[in-house]
Amino acid sequence: MSDAPKRSLNPTLMMNNNNTPPKPLEESLDLKEFIALFKTFFAKERDTIALENDLKQTFTYLNEVDAIGLPTPKSVKESDLIIIKLTKLGTLHLDEIFEIVKRLHYIVVLQNAFKTFTHLKFHERLNAIVLPPFFNDLIALFDDEGKIKQGANATLDALNESLNRLKKESVKIIHHYARSKELAPYLVDTQSHLKHGYECLLLKSGFSGAIKGVVLERSANGYFYLLPESAQKIAQKIAQIGNEIDCCIVEMCQTLSHSLQKHLLFLKFLFKEFDFLDSLQARLNFAKAYNLEFVMPSFTQKKMILENFSHPILKEPKPLNLKFEKSMLAVTGVNAGGKTMLLKSLLSAAFLSKHLIPMKINAHHSIIPYFKEIHAIINDPQNSANNISTFAGRMKQFSALLSKENMLLGVDEIELGTDADEASSLYKTLLEKLLKQNNQIIITTHHKRLSVLMAENKEVELLAALYDEEKERPTYTFLKGVIGKSYAFETALRYGVPHFLIEKAKTFYGEDKEKLNVLIENSSALERELKQKNEHLENALKEQEYLKNAWLLEMEKQKEIFHNKKLELEKSYQQALNILKSEVASKDTSSMHKEIHKASEILSKHKTNQEIPQIITNFQANEKARYKNESVLIVQILDKGYYWIETELGMRLKAHGSLLKKIQKPPKNKFKPPKTTIPKPKEASLRLDLRGQRSEEALDLLDAFLNDALLGGFEEVLICHGKGSGILEKFVKEFLKNHPKVVSFSDAPINLGGSGVKIVKL
């Protein structure tokens, strides 16, 4: 088997007659290397990548810890054997106890790191892990290398001290002989060699007269590894102390194992929590290392929208942008034009999203439904040993799926292995049955007849891979709503088939079928032209909508300015009136005159400095004139040199004749007013930070910010309210729901602030 997960979601459909295991789904979708790379981020080697916890809860945790980050734990081994030993009242080895300590230490590190983030749900999850006092003592017993710390056991400390002293003496003896003049003729080198746990010398033959000892081994060159007689006694003592140390450690392991047996249920809980935290940090660190994004699968929507998705197997991918809004997608078109990779990309996105594995995608604008099962019929199932042909294998795979519901099925080259006309009728029947069972299906095919038959179904979308006839190459782009041509002759020519053979093949192909291909090409070209026109019209409508919204905002702004000015004048008038009343009441004439003068000064501050020019031009009704930088129409002549005028946007206002100018040589034909450009605010920003503001202040800032954004022509803005107690978030949501110009809003992706930031579409 490959290193793919054993519990993948039914990757292929069944085993062969000889019980050969089917190819895993991730291998069929070319995700094997990507998944293998992802697995390297786990602390514990594992077969499965599936999440045992709730997806929504896990996604919430990922959003919360994204900005903070999660440390990487030390590599750990499988815990099943530890549980089995403790269940059977066995004794754990020191390294097995250290496996428990590594997990405990990581959880303590996380609890300390998130101690201040009490508002996070992830903090609640960590706080639910309460370590019994025994485990705190157990952590303190080991150093980072998995050895017993000095001071933890007095007997062990004394033995280690004796062992170190004896080893130093042994090394000293070896170094003494290595510098000895009597032994120099027999020394191969002056180094100390470690053999069978003993420090020894490497000597040439004939040394027996110069030194006594035990030969431990001979080298490949015929030399002798000798343990000197004087060092032999020390080596025996070292071995004896080593045995005593082992006995001491065994006693400690027995004591610790006995204590761990009392906490067996907690250990099972600990291992399960560590595995979850490990899967969490692996996903987060994998996403950060390769700049990937998470997509939470939708449990309510059936449509699939991918924006800027890139399949991991492609080195220089062309990002995929696709909306799959119906129950079935039939992909046709040019050979080697990307149909199979499109199929694999859609299935891969669903597979990665289901397991919350990050991918290269614009997560904010993408929607991926949750599928209970995902199946791929991509590879040729032919098996000569079991007497199974290509078509028979396909039928066997389909028969296993006919009872499935709520699955995503991908079938590559659906017509493979049999007569095209018969296959069209057969597959139409099979596909319609699967569609009735609430399944979603993606197929690639060159069957024009099958595509035409399926196109009659309202739940079927058509998609064609396009071909550039000028460059004679596929464009790796797709067009909705049409059946594509295969371009088999052009593809064969591109891959080296001689031109004269291609021409001969075309004569056999027949004039009628060539005409059918021409009709298909013309239909495709017409569809592309209509699509371009629709895009042009949509852009024009958006521009008009923007101008309309900008004008409405400008009107509201002018009304507000007028209202504020009115209040200011009323306040000034009341202030001057109060001064006069107070002086009249005091009956002080001289003071009264002074205060009247003072009141006049207050009122004079608010008089307009603008004087009406004396040069006035007369106009007639329905005459065109220029007001500031706009072309206007004279609607009505008023008294005292004033006129009612109408702007190009249909707005009527009163203006003095001095502000109007004659238009020289007006055009004889239809009046074409120039485009009006509403000035954008200089201080418009894409982001507003409301953290630390009171609700009333925040709503005022938010209202002004949205007005500036609309005038600035922004379609999306960011509003940061923080995560706190949620009161400010509630006010912001309520305001956005009731704002007439807000199309929609949602939480930002993890890298932009998560649930503490709203992305607002205007």
From Swiss-Prot:
Description of how activity is regulated: ATPase activity is stimulated by DNA.
Knockout mutant characteristics: Mutants have a significantly increased frequency of intergenomic recombination. They are more sensitive than wild-type cells to oxidative stress induced by agents such as H(2)O(2), paraquat or oxygen. They also have a reduced colonization capacity in a mouse model of infection.
Entry superkingdom: Bacteria
Transmembrane regions: none
Smr domain location: 688-762
GO MF, one example: ATP binding
EC number from the UniProt entry: 3.1.-.-, 3.6.4.-
GO biological process: mismatch repair; negative regulation of DNA recombination; rescue of stalled ribosome
Keyword rRNA-binding: yes
Keywords: ATP-binding, DNA-binding, Endonuclease, Hydrolase, Nuclease, Nucleotide-binding, RNA-binding, rRNA-binding
Biased segments, Low complexity type: 9-20
Positions of the UniProt region annotated as Disordered: 1-22
Top-tier EC class: hydrolase
Residues reported in the UniProt entry to bind ATP: G333, V334, N335, A336, G337, G338, K339, T340
Reported function: Endonuclease that is involved in the suppression of homologous recombination and may thus have a key role in the control of bacterial genetic diversity. Also involved in repairing oxidative DNA damage. Has ATPase activity. Binds DNA.
Oligomer status and interactors: Homodimer. Binds to stalled ribosomes, contacting rRNA.
Family to which this protein belongs: Belongs to the DNA mismatch repair MutS family. MutS2 subfamily.
Protein name per UniProt: Endonuclease MutS2
